[in-house]
Amino acid sequence: MEALKADVTKGLERGSLVTCADNTGARELKVISVMGSSGTKNRHPKAGIGDQVTVSVTKGTPEMRRQVLEAVIVRQRKSIRRPDGTRVKFEDNAAVIIDEMEEPRGTEIKGPIAREVAERFGSIASTATMIV
């Protein structure tokens, strides 16, 4: 996984509810853990745009509910700062479910995704309709 160019402020922590931005059948996801976070004692792991997280499906089709899956954060409400000084924030917190090869499980992604996600995950960028 390559480093992001933007200064991403981590806007989500363990237990946060995010919307699912693809058509896998899941509607709402709960963040269980963050990949690669080795924190301090009693400190919640935080996640931001482009981070890979483990999620549990809280709302969706009966086949998808209560499954534990991997996902990538593609939108967050907390603003992030880009190298040119602009700040970007979205209307909601959203994630895309991925498989073990880091390919999206769905065939389409609803809504825009951040450019930082497109740089790190090319397969998600090719599926997305809008990159901001």
Curated annotation (Swiss-Prot):
Give me any GO biological process, just one: translation
Q: Name one GO molecular function term.
A: large ribosomal subunit rRNA binding
Pfam families (UniProt xref)? Ribosomal_L14
Establish whether keyword Acyltransferase is in the entry.
no
**Keywords of this entry:** Ribonucleoprotein, Ribosomal protein, RNA-binding, rRNA-binding
Q: Which domain of life is it from?
A: Archaea
Is Iron-sulfur a UniProt keyword of this protein? no
Q: Which GO terms describe its cellular component?
A: cytosolic large ribosomal subunit
What InterPro entries does the database record attribute to this sequence?
A: Ribosomal_uL14, Ribosomal_uL14_arc, Ribosomal_uL14_CS, Ribosomal_uL14_sf
Main function = Binds to 23S rRNA. Forms part of two intersubunit bridges in the 70S ribosome.
**What is annotated about its quaternary structure and interactions?**
Part of the 50S ribosomal subunit. Forms a cluster with proteins L3 and L24e, part of which may contact the 16S rRNA in 2 intersubunit bridges.
Spell out the family assignment given in the record's similarity comment. Answer: Belongs to the universal ribosomal protein uL14 family.
UniProt name for this protein: Large ribosomal subunit protein uL14
Which organism is the protein's source? Haloquadratum walsbyi (strain DSM 16790 / HBSQ001)
What gene is it encoded by? Answer: rpl14
